[in-house]
Amino acid sequence: FKRYIFFTGNYFKSKNISGITYFLDTRYLIDRNFYLRENYEDYLYSIANKLIILNKVNFFLDIGSCWGIYSLRLSGIKKLRIFSFDPILDNITRLKKMIKINNLKNIQTFNTALGSKKGKVKFYGLEKFTPNYSLYDKRHKNFTVSKIDKLDNLIKMNKKVLYLKVDIERHEYHFLLGAKNILK
């Protein structure tokens, strides 16, 4: 038995899941699944949630946050500060809208790519509306330009416990090169 749901007109749907209101773009598979099933990478999320609480983590860095599903879901952990990084302006704009509507004070957003240098880079996406872009999939005709910087240039922390979620489409090595100081 398969269930099908079709959306017409306004692709953005608002839905409250576990006390957080999300604005989901049903043209995109992850958003659609989260809208219908109310979960996304639950196994990984539950591990992150448990480890953050168990280790009294001070900062959660959501590198490649997209529209912030991890940041939003973890925002209820007391005393946790969240830094969400994404190079795609539409993703950050949507995340900021959800931060505002949910009155969240512990999430700070950064509209930048992270790597081993400072400058500008071109990201390629399969569709114009997709939240996922890549530096390396140049066969896609849709693109956007973003600034790029080292994590070490953007935030400073001493003797704090960090939890990093890094999902940046094969650019992880370059991210790590730009995060040497913060990871010491």
Predicted regions and their residues:
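Phosphate/nucleotide-binding beta-alpha loop and adjacent structural elements of enzyme active sites
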Residues: F1-K184
